[in-house]
Amino acid sequence: MHQHPRSSVPSPAPNFPPRPTARDDRREQEAAPSSPTVDMGSNSARGLGIEPGPQPSEQGRNAALGREALTRLNQIISNYHTKAALIILHSRVALPPSFNKGSESPRVNRWFNVELDDTDVLREPLRPWRTCDATDNRPPPLVIETYLDTKGLTNNQSLVILDENGKRWDVRESLAALQGARAKPYQSENDEIILERWRIELGESSSRLPADLGSILPTVYKKSIVLFRSLFTYSKFLPAWRFSKRNKKLRQSPALQIKYRVVDGSVARDDLSLDHLTAPLSEGSEKVVDTYSFGVTESPAGPFSVQVTYRTNCDFRVDDSEALLSSRFMGADDEIFRPSLPSDDVNRPNPEIGSVPVERKAVENPDCTRAYGSLSTFHQVGPTTGASPISTLRAMRDSGAGSPSPTDSPKRLLPPAKVVPSGRAGQIAGEGGSSNFQRRPSVSFQPFKAPPLSASPALADSPLGMSPRNMSSRIPTGTSADSRVMPPPSSAASARRPTTIASEQAISSSNSASPKPAPISRYSSSFSHRRGRLSAGANRLEDDNSSGRASATSSNAQPGSGLLTEATGTSAESIQADDENISEFLKMLDSKKDLMNSSTSASIQPGPSTTAAALARFRGMRDSNAALSDSMSQSMHMHRSSISSSKQLSGVPPMVAGTSISTASSPGKPMSPHTPHTPHTPAIRSRLSSNSVADDIETDHHSRLPRIHHDPPLEEHSSAENTRAPSSTAGAIDIPTSPRIFNPAYRRSSSAAVRRPIVTSDDDEIFPFGIRSLSLGADESANATLGATQQQNESQKDQQSPAEDRSGPSVSTTGPYRDSASLRGQMSGPTSASASSNPHVYQPRFASSRGRGYSGGHSLSSASSSLARGANLTPHLAERDQDRDGNASGSNSGNSTLEIRRGSGQRPSTGRTLSGQAPEDDEPLLFAMSDFGASRRSLDEGRHGNHGGTESAAGSRRGSGRRGAGLPGFHVWS
């Protein structure tokens, strides 16, 4: 009895589960089916009431199982829509999270094994889908749209979209153009651009709910997990997601913030309205929208489906309205007018700003530099580098485009730069032109400086001895017409004799094979009208006879003008091109009178006051400049032959004496004693070049002869400052000797320019030549040098003939080599002790050889190279050689003259009478001396009057034996 009332208490338990299914409380609905223990409790409670009868309990149990399965199915349908909306919107917009009661942690939605923060924002928009069921209240299709609202734009902002080509399109104008054809457009959608449209739909069921619904629902739930995971992943691959992420990083305009709305898909849309999702916003071949379906998930209530339609291009931006309008105007005439023939300005590179006379002949399609002429006379149009033509062409390859011409400039354009003519034609044009600008002197060069294949000079100026540039080397272009005109530096003759601003120095180098142009100032010296002289003797006559072209030493060029690139030859093509372009160049100069603008020239060139002050200061230095020019002229005349011959010393190290100054190997410009741009070379004799004084005898003979006749012979004891006072006042410097393969037994005297006192003896009456010792030290008493020898020869020429007749046989049997052999074989202690004081002892340079340079080494001498290059001998030298040697052969005369210059000819025998035997009897030498015996026998025959071909052959043999034919193939420098 007690159990029946208790059993009646749980009997209404199956009625509790339907209570949480009320539509007004969602949380209770979700909590009730989530706890299966409630259902089990009800079943157990129902199982306890079996006693009333089997029929009522079976029907109630089946009804309870059906209601439970249906409740779970309804929960799946509800969460199917809400979870899809949560996944889609969480990846597009920022949703505020919802919190549990009494907790600060956000509530997490874990349905379908995808954890997302739950939010209360979607409760109201999704209410119809949260309260739906599978039988009575089926859910309508859920449509979620993401869009951009243009109402947040200001008046000067426009929403634009970039097409596949990068062109901007105004979205509002595109929509307005599309809505113009619509009868009733939705006003709410006028300013909205739909990006995506998601559709979540539950299809109609084909049959009634199955009886085993509870066993089918777990399978439906597992299939939905796969669907929602794919939805979560694919939603982050669409263009709208990339657009939203970019906006979050850049924090762009509020108009670019993605918005959303939830729409009932069952509401029919008016066909006349414009769909802002499929409306094309730009012209192009790309597809406007695309559709993706996630498949169908079968359920007892019907098929579940998720589908998305999205814009393929979501590259939206907010631009300024005026900028967008300006860009349209700039490209408005692209397709309006297109000429049938191409314009000439298309292929014309680097237009130059400025006006040009209409009659100027335009060059049709010039190349990158318009270079003409040979490598020696290189002219170009464009930026100049001052280097070789190859380097200039290489640098012009990367030249950038010039400044665009203004709108008011004529269509006819200038070439990239002016063509600067070269040669005499350019000089005539500079003198005859009526331009206010000073003409730059033209430059040409002597052909084939040694070596003929010269390397290109460096781009940079030489770092040694350079004076700073005081004036700019180029005239600025693009200036206005009301600019100041630079005043001429001097009076009427300013075009021919400009005043010097800064003199540049040329640096000599024995290693460099090509001259590098030294920087030249804007204004040259007022003495630049004087003719310059190259130091080479062979080029002097050519310089004197050249009428049209100035030599390289007397010419000036602007730094970086491209004219001093290669000091080789003057090409006939460049001269012809200069003559053809003179008229055009003068017209261009007349039209460019407005180049000297104060705005640009002030930063480049000094003002007129500074220029005038500098010119006035340098005008006062004309006297010192004249004295300097005269001093340089004398010193260069003295060293012309020695300097010119030094360029043949290719195997000599850089600092070896005799190669200190060279015109062809200087890195700077060629030197001249008459131009202020050449350095002042002091008259310092080097050791190698002091052996040859061909030019000293040639140029200073008339100035020395009166002094020699009036001075007594005892004055020869004076130094070189007394004898050579008119020529030079500089002393000699001790330059290190050249490298040699044998250790020298004696040190060579450094009496190159300083004249040592001449020690006279009794033999001077017979041998008037002061013999110079080549083996004495610098501090020891040396014999008279070659200058003193020549002076004694000049003063005692009349008394010399009898002495030469007496000394003929002695000289024929003696000589420098004979003396050296005798000294090596017979020198004893006293003889060695007196060797330094004996003025007639000729000691060899090497103790065990015939001397330095006799196997071809003498060709390095500046005297022999000067003769080989064609240095002319004066007639009185040839006559003196014939009187002394008694032969008229050209070979003997040349060799005798060379011996006189070397100080090695007609050496006395120091009082000892030696027989004419072969010198091999005295001491075994390093080289065979048979050649010298034959030459001495021929010389003996020549002394007795044989002046025929035999003497000529013997003289040639003697010269070859003394000049290095003794042992072929041996060279002391090798």
UniProtKB/Swiss-Prot annotation:
Name of a matching Pfam family: ATG13
Keywords: Autophagy, Cytoplasm, Protein transport, Transport
Cross-referenced InterPro entries: ATG13 (IPR040182), Atg13_N (IPR018731), HORMA_dom_sf (IPR036570)
Polar residues composition-biased segments: 1-10, 32-45, 379-391, 434-445, 469-482, 547-559, 720-730, 823-840, 906-916
Compositional bias of kind Basic and acidic residues: 21-30, 703-719, 877-886
Biased composition (Pro residues): 11-20
One BP annotation, GO: protein transport
Annotated stretches, region: Disordered: 1-61, 379-575, 661-689, 703-743, 787-974
Described purpose of this protein according to its UniProt entry: Activates the atg1 kinase in a nutritional condition dependent manner through the TOR pathway, leading to autophagy. Also involved in cytoplasm to vacuole transport (Cvt) and more specifically in Cvt vesicle formation. Seems to play a role in the switching machinery regulating the conversion between the Cvt pathway and autophagy. Finally, atg13 is also required for glycogen storage during stationary phase.
Name of the protein: Autophagy-related protein 13
Subcellular location(s) of the protein: Cytoplasm; Preautophagosomal structure
Subunit annotation: Interacts with atg1 to form the atg1-atg13 kinase complex.
Gene name of the encoded protein: atg13
Family assignment from sequence similarity: Belongs to the ATG13 family. Fungi subfamily.
Transport recorded as keyword: yes
Biased composition (Low complexity): 451-464, 491-521, 790-800, 848-873, 887-896
Organism: Penicillium rubens (strain ATCC 28089 / DSM 1075 / NRRL 1951 / Wisconsin 54-1255) (Penicillium chrysogenum)
Any one GO CC term of the record: phagophore assembly site
